């Protein structure tokens, strides 16, 4: 199911079902009780992720499909894989990463889970655990019936559940270690430094501690341990490939775009004040002024950006969105047509143009 968010213009999808991944919280959910996640479709961000992921999948000998990339509307630091080699990246990961090397490390780590067959193995382990859980419930019921004591049943079931949890999490830690090792090899093959992966892991660890979460693999979906960071420190020392000196302009634009669409306008303008005349900052300003309905300011900045980069399809897409959202359908069609001419294979641009066409000619 898809719908258009009338505030951001991003396409949002809701996916319901059991995501069989390394997420601990999904480990004990049934198909019926699994939570929904909100997804965002954005051509510019997905193109960036595709450029990052394609060489990693190639190095891992995994078929690449752009449609396997999903952006999760969640500001936490996380990424995970699902069935069918689907890659899910949280918006928080993109917004809080310092550079594309950190994103490459995250994607390489998740690709390591695919290489290790961890999704299928996790499914099998969960099925086995469900059978054990059912057996413990039956045993507890039998004990209660035989002794007349309900506490006997509770003790049996609690003991079984505790053992299952410990076994599951110990297994998960081993999977994370395996994925780290595979990721370092993939980064080596693609001539990228593992420094970003190390730095991002440290970022997660710092955030956990700031949030009052002690390092405890029993309550983390991707447990950060001193051993893992030490392993990556060693990998960084041995790697012949340096980390990028600074983030690319492309990555900075994506961070600015996501921030401008998803964060509070006041926070966005603190991050990207009007005094900042860089392209990423002005991109963010154009978006946030649009959200604040300061359309003249938004279009003035956006027209300047288009004058500087007339062949940038994403600037034309944004201008089309502004016109579309404010009921100016014909100019919206013109901008969407321009964006599509610059990026003719974009399914999202085709949808934008088709929607504008329907609005312009409803009959």
Where are the language model's segments positioned?
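Bacterial N-terminal signal peptides
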Residues: 13-27
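Extracytoplasmic and endomembrane cell-envelope/extracellular-matrix remodeling and assembly machinery
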Residues: 36, 41, 47, 69, ...
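Active-site recognition of the HExxH zinc-binding catalytic motif
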Residues: 89, 105-113, 117, 179
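Short pre-active-site segment immediately N-terminal to the catalytic Zn-binding motif
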Residues: 91-105
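Catalytic Zn2+-binding segment of zinc metalloproteases
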Residues: 101, 111-128, 146
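Membrane-active amphipathic alpha-helices enriched in small hydrophobic residues
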Residues: 131-146, 151, 155-167
């Amino acid at each position: 199911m898809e719908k258009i968010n009338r505030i951001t213009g991003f396409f949002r999808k809701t996916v319901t079902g059991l995501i069989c991944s390394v997420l601990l919280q999904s480990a004990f959910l049934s198909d019926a009780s699994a939570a929904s996640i909100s997804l965002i479709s954005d051509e510019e961000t997905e193109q960036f992720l595709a450029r990052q992921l394609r060489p990693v999948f190639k190095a891992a000998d995994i078929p690449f499909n752009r449609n396997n990339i999903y952006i999760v509307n969640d500001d936490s630091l996380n990424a995970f894989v699902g069935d069918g080699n689907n890659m899910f990246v949280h918006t928080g990961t993109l917004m809080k990463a310092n550079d594309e090397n950190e994103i490459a490390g995250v994607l390489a780590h998740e690709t390591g889970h695919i290489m290790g067959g961890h999704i299928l193995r996790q499914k099998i382990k969960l099925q086995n655990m469900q059978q054990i859980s059912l057996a413990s419930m039956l045993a507890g019921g039998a004990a209660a019936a035989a002794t007349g004591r309900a506490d006997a049943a509770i003790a049996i079931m609690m003991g079984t559940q505790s053992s299952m949890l410990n076994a599951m999490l110990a297994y998960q830690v081993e999977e994370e270690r395996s994925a780290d090792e595979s990721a370092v090899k993939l980064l080596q093959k693609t001539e990228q430094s593992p420094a970003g992966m190390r730095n991002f892991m440290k970022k997660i660890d710092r955030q956990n501690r700031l949030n009052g979460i002690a390092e405890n693999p029993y309550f983390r979906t991707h447990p950060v341990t001193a051993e893992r960071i030490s392993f990556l420190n060693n990998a960084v020392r041995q790697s012949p490939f340096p980390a990028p000196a600074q983030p690319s302009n492309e990555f900075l634009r994506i961070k600015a775009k996501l921030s401008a669409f998803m964060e509070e306008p006041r926070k966005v303008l603190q991050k990207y004040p009007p005094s900042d005349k860089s392209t990423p900052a002005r991109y963010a300003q154009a978006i946030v002024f649009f959200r604040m309905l300061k359309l003249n300011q938004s279009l003035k900045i956006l027209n300047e950006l288009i004058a500087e980069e007339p062949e940038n399809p994403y600037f034309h897409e944004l201008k089309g969105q502004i016109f579309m959202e404010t009921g100016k359908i014909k100019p919206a069609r013109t901008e969407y047509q321009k964006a599509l001419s610059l990026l003719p294979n974009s399914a999202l641009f085709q949808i934008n143009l088709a929607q504008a066409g329907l609005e312009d000619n409803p009959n």
